[in-house]
């Protein structure tokens, strides 16, 4: 008699998930190396090598520094009244005017850079009793000696240099930036030749601040034929405040003011070429895409940029745990469901069914559970980017030599921030990966439990992700299980009958083994009894003597 399990009265249904031959290794909270079917790289590690001029307005400084453009160096006149989102200073920038220094260079550079404009308004300062528009052979404007266009070099008139006292109120509703300077002659002779007094003095004040500078006369290294220097200073005058300038010599006077603006403009040193392209994020190495949450191209950035981290690679799992299919198995030879391994070749879904019935074998994806997993995973990358992308710029820090300790402290703080963000990135990605794997495992379990609840006593869990269905289940029946319309009551009697027949036959087949074992045991027992009886009989007849020695 044929077993019911071996004819067309039963079917097998397995549930499984997608797998690939070679997955991607990711890190989770509980495992440093776990293989998944798919993962997305989160660290941008290369730039385009060029700076894109859109959507940010890029101003190429060419051979001018921002401060030279601010002061009005003759070869930087093209930058007058320019505006920018990002001013790019080049490595070949140089000065071509009277040698100068800015005691608070970094602050002035940062202030002007963030303002994003060199808009200049000339004002009518009155300088009585002195000669204006001084020039130098170190600052040629064409063939003639010249000077910074935004500054006015005042010298003696005849043999006198009177005390100057000039006021300029700010009657506007915006801040005004005044640039002025103090000339340090190289010799006492030069001092008296230019300013009469043996020692000058310059005081610039507002209601909020006051600066008094006394020239430091002395020879310095020769630069462009000059051993004297000019020190550049700056003063911000708030609305309603007044600028007061008092001097008896050595004054490099302002010609007007720069209109200050507040914004997100900045400055960056870079030798990358500027090209016509679109990129939200700019680094000194060039523009980089901002579709990843992290980057390790450069610490210095401008725009909406990924967060800088030390890692070269961080992979976000965008697929499920990968368990490659055992290639030695056939479709339904000895294969198992998801508990043992995944299935390769499922191109239309992440989860699905394989079946074997009277009509043959087949496979189909479960789109609902697949879509549920995909919907939750798709938002992960955007959420990570939202958490990490900076909508502001990280400017480069500059300090003078005397501020070495501050520079060291700043470097320590920046390095610590990078270390913290690198650690945070590791933890964040590991947590997201753990959640993804748990999520995809959960969807598989949900589908399995949903199928179990439908089949009830009509099928038996085989323990490997498959069900043995104890009734005839054609393709239409299999489809009803997949789409959730299966009615177990229709097949209940048939399933119970087949189950009892199969179990009964299996039980009868099992009795043969028990009978064999029991028969063998009884035979051994009887043999022992006969042997013992023979020995006792022989002892009584005297044919066998047994001596016991103590």
UniProtKB/Swiss-Prot annotation:
Lipidation (S-palmitoyl cysteine): 539, 546, 549
Xref: InterPro entries: Capsid_hemagglutn (IPR008980), Hemagglutn_HA1_a/b_dom_sf (IPR013828), Hemagglutn_influenz_A (IPR000149), Hemagglutn_influenz_A/B (IPR001364)
Example of a GO MF term: host cell surface receptor binding
An example Gene Ontology CC term for this record: membrane
Disulfide cross-links: 14-466, 52-277, 64-76, 97-139, 281-305, 473-477
Gene Ontology annotations of biological process type: clathrin-dependent endocytosis of virus by host cell; fusion of virus membrane with host endosome membrane; fusion of virus membrane with host plasma membrane; virion attachment to host cell
Extracellular domain ranges by topology: 1-514
UniProtKB keywords: Clathrin- and caveolin-independent endocytosis of virus by host, Clathrin-mediated endocytosis of virus by host, Disulfide bond, Fusion of virus membrane with host endosomal membrane, Fusion of virus membrane with host membrane, Glycoprotein, Hemagglutinin, Host cell membrane, Host membrane, Host-virus interaction, Lipoprotein, Membrane, Palmitate, Transmembrane, Transmembrane helix, Viral attachment to host cell, Viral envelope protein, Viral penetration into host cytoplasm, Virion, Virus endocytosis by host, Virus entry into host cell
Pfam families: Hemagglutinin
Residues annotated as glycosylated: 8, 22, 38, 165, 285, 483
Coiled-coil residue windows: none
Keyword Glycoprotein on entry: yes
Presence of keyword Transmembrane helix: yes
Function: Binds to sialic acid-containing receptors on the cell surface, bringing about the attachment of the virus particle to the cell. This attachment induces virion internalization either through clathrin-dependent endocytosis or through clathrin- and caveolin-independent pathway. Plays a major role in the determination of host range restriction and virulence. Class I viral fusion protein. Responsible for penetration of the virus into the cell cytoplasm by mediating the fusion of the membrane of the endocytosed virus particle with the endosomal membrane.
Subunit structure of this chain's protein: Homotrimer of disulfide-linked HA1-HA2.
Note: Major glycoprotein, comprises over 80% of the envelope proteins present in virus particle.
Protein name, per record: Hemagglutinin
Organism: Influenza A virus (strain A/Duck/Hong Kong/7/1975 H3N2)
Lineage: Viruses, Riboviria, Orthornavirae, Negarnaviricota, Polyploviricotina
């Amino acid at each position: 008699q044929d077993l019911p399990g071996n004819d067309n009265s039963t079917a097998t249904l397995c549930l499984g998930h997608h797998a690939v031959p070679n997955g991607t290794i990711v890190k989770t909270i509980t495992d440093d190396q776990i293989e998944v079917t798919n993962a997305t790289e989160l660290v941008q590690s290369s730039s385009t090598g060029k700076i894109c001029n859109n959507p940010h307005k890029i101003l190429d400084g060419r051979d001018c520094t921002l401060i030279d453009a601010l002061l009005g160096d003759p070869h930087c006149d093209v930058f007058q009244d320019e505006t920018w989102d990002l001013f790019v200073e080049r490595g070949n920038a140089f000065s071509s005017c009277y040698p100068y220094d800015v005691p608070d260079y970094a602050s002035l550079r940062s202030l002007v850079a963030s303002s994003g404009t060199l808009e200049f308004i000339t004002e009518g300062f009155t300088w009585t009793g002195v000669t204006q528009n001084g020039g130098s052979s170190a600052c040629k404007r064409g063939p003639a000696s010249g000077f910074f266009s935004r500054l006015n070099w005042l010298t003696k008139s005849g043999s006198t240099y009177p005390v100057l006292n000039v006021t300029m109120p700010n009657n506007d509703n915006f801040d005004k930036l005044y640039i002025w300077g103090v000339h340090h002659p190289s010799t006492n002779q030069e001092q008296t030749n230019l300013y009469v007094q043996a020692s000058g003095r310059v005081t610039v004040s507002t209601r909020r601040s006051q600066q008094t500078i006394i020239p430091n006369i002395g020879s310095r290294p020769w630069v462009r034929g000059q051993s004297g220097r000019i020190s550049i200073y700056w003063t911000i005058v708030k609305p309603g405040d007044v600028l007061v300038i008092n001097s008896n010599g050595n004054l490099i006077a302002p010609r007007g003011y720069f209109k200050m603006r507040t914004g997100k403009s900045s400055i960056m040193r870079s030798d990358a070429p500027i090209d016509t392209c679109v990129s939200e994020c700019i680094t000194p190495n060039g523009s980089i895409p901002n579709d990843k949450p992290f980057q390790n191209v450069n610490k210095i950035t401008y725009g909406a940029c990924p967060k800088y981290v030390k890692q070269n690679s961080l992979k976000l799992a965008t697929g499920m745990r990968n368990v490659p299919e055992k290639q030695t198995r056939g479709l339904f030879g000895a294969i198992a469901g998801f508990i043992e391994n995944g299935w390769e070749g499922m191109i239309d879904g992440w989860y699905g069914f394989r079946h074997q019935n009277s009509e043959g074998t087949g496979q189909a994806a479960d789109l609902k559970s697949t879509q549920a997993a995909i919907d939750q995973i798709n938002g992960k990358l955007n959420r990570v980017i939202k958490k990490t992308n900076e909508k502001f710029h990280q400017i480069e820090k500059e300090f003078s030599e005397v501020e070495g300790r501050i520079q060291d402290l700043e470097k320590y703080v920046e390095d610590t921030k990078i270390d913290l963000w690198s650690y945070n990135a590791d933890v964040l990605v590991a947590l997201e990966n753990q959640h993804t794997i748990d999520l995809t495992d959960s969807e598989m379990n949900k589908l399995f439990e949903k199928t179990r609840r439908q089949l009830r006593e009509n099928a038996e869990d085989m323990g490997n992700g498959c069900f043995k269905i104890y009734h005839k289940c054609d393709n239409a029946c299999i489809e009803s299980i997949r789409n959730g319309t299966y009615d177990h009551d229709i097949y209940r009697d048939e399933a119970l009958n087949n189950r009892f027949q199969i179990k009964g036959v299996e039980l009868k087949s099992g009795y043969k083994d028990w009978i064999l074992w029991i028969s063998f045991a009884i035979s051994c027992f009887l043999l022992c009894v006969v042997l013992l009886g023979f020995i006792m009989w022989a002892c009584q007849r005297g044919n066998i003597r047994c001596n016991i020695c103590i």
